[in-house]
Amino acid sequence: MVAALLPQRCPMTITLNHTIVPARDKVAAARFFADLFGLRFDDRGGHFAPVRVNETLTLLFDDDDAFESHHYAFHVSGAEFDAILERINTTGLTYGSAPWSLDDGKLNDWNGGRGVYFKDPNGHVLELMTAPQ
């Protein structure tokens, strides 16, 4: 959908370095995310509870009492998708094929890949998607 709006070639190499994820309990939220995505969380204290997603992206979980839920989308490999989906099923999280259908228990195949949506304990909508196969 969004890809159709982008030019074929992007003239710059831009990566997202970090973003702040609001949570009622930053440590619990960081642990949830790290456990579900198969990442490590090292609680060294400090203002943020950081989870390093890859070599360029860190999610900085931060305590907040009042926040709107956000949508975070992650492009993952097929193997990563399978492993995370297995952990979603093991933990009993509901999931769905679209942001408007978060509990239908189905995956989508938009753009030739696989996708799934689910909510974290803070109400943020998380999306996993794979490349076309």
Task: Describe the predicted segments one by one.
Residues 2-27, 72, 132-133:
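N-terminal beta-strand motif that seeds the catalytic metal site of vicinal oxygen chelate
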Residues 18-20, 50, 71-73, 115-117:
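Short aromatic/hydrophobic contact patches that present stacked aromatics
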Residues 52, 62, 119, 129-130:
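Residue-level detector of conserved, well-ordered beta-strand and adjacent loop positions
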Residues 56-58, 66-68, 77-82:
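Short, charged/polar surface micro-motifs in flexible loops or helix N-caps
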Residues 74-121, 125, 132-133:
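Vicinal oxygen chelate
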